[in-house]
C-alpha cells in the first residue's frame, strides 16, 4: 500500500499527507502501479468533462477536461515532452542534448510541442464517440507503456530521478505495468461492447517500442523527460485511433 501511495504522491498533486521512507527499490516497484495512477487521472478528467458537458458545448467541456488533467498531474509529463522536444530538435551532440533537457527554461521547440500536444488532445476528444470512456482510458494507455520504455534501458546520466527507474525495474514489474494497464483497457472495452478497442493495446505498445528506439538513437538511452514525452505521445495516439474508428463507423 505504501508503494501505491508513494506513486500517487510522486505522479499527481493529490494531497496525501503521509510520510514514507523512500528508496530506489520502492520507486522501481511502484512502476507496476503507474496504470492505476493513470486510471485515477482518467476518472478525474472524465468526471470534469461529464459535469461540464451539462453546462457547456462539447469543445468547452473537453477544454476543461484537458485542464483537469494538467491540474491533477501538475503537467508532470507535459514538462518532459517540452524538454525532450527542445533537446531532440536542437540538432546538437548527445551531451548537449542531455544538458538542454536539464535546463529549466522552455525553448521554441518545447513551446511548439506543448501547443500541439494540448491542441491535438482538445480537437481529437471533441470529435470522438464516447468521450467519457476515452478520457478514462487514454491516461491508462500512456502509463501502460512505461515499463517497456524503462526495462533494460540505459540511463545516460550519473544521477537524476529517472536513475531510480530506467534500467532498474525487473521483468516482473515491466510485465505487471503492461498487463495491468492493458488488462484494464481490454476488460473495460469488452464490458462496454467496444471490443475493437482491445486492438489499441498492441498498437500502443509497438509505438512505444518505436519511440524508445528513436530516443535511444538520439541520446543513447532514456531519461525521465523522455518517459514523460512517451506518455504524452501514446495518449495522443490513443485519442487519434479512437477518432479514426469513429470516422470509419467502427465505434458509434
Task: Give the residues covered by each predicted segment.
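Histidine-centered active-site/metal-ligand motif
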Residues: 77
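Hydrophobic alpha-helical transmembrane segments
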Residues: 1-74, 92-98, 103-252
Amino acid at each position: 500500500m505504501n508503494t501505491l501511495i508513494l506513486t500517487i504522491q510522486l505522479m499527481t498533486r493529490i494531497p496525501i499527507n503521509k510520510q514514507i521512507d523512500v528508496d530506489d527499490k520502492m520507486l522501481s516497484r511502484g512502476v507496476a502501479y503507474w496504470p492505476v495512477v493513470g486510471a485515477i487521472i482518467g476518472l478525474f478528467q472524465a468526471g470534469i468533462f461529464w459535469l461540464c458537458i451539462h453546462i457547456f458545448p462539447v469543445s468547452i467541456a473537453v477544454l476543461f477536461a484537458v485542464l483537469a488533467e494538467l491540474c491533477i498531474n501538475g503537467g508532470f509529463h507535459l514538462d518532459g515532452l517540452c524538454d525532450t522536444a527542445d533537446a531532440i530538435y536542437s540538432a546538437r551532440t548527445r551531451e548537449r542534448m542531455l544538458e538542454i533537457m536539464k535546463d529549466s527554461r522552455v525553448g521554441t521547440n518545447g513551446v511548439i510541442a506543448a501547443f500541439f500536444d494540448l491542441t491535438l488532445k482538445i480537437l481529437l476528444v471533441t470529435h470522438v464517440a464516447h468521450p467519457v470512456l476515452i478520457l478514462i482510458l487514454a491516461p491508462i494507455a500512456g502509463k501502460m507503456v512505461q515499463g517497456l520504455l524503462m526495462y533494460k534501458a540505459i540511463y545516460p546520466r550519473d544521477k537524476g530521478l529517472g536513475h531510480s527507474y530506467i534500467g532498474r525495474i525487473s521483468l516482473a514489474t515491466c510485465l505487471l505495468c503492461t498487463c495491468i494497464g492493458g488488462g484494464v483497457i481490454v476488460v473495460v472495452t469488452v464490458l462496454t461492447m467496444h471490443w475493437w478497442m482491445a486492438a489499441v493495446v498492441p498498437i500502443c505498445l509497438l509505438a512505444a517500442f518505436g519511440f524508445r528506439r528513436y530516443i535511444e538513437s538520439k541520446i543513447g538511452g532514456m531519461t525521465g523527460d523522455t518517459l514523460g514525452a512517451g506518455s504524452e505521445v501514446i495518449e495522443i495516439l490513443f485519442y487519434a485511433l479512437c477518432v479514426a474508428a469513429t470516422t470509419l463507423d467502427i465505434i458509434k
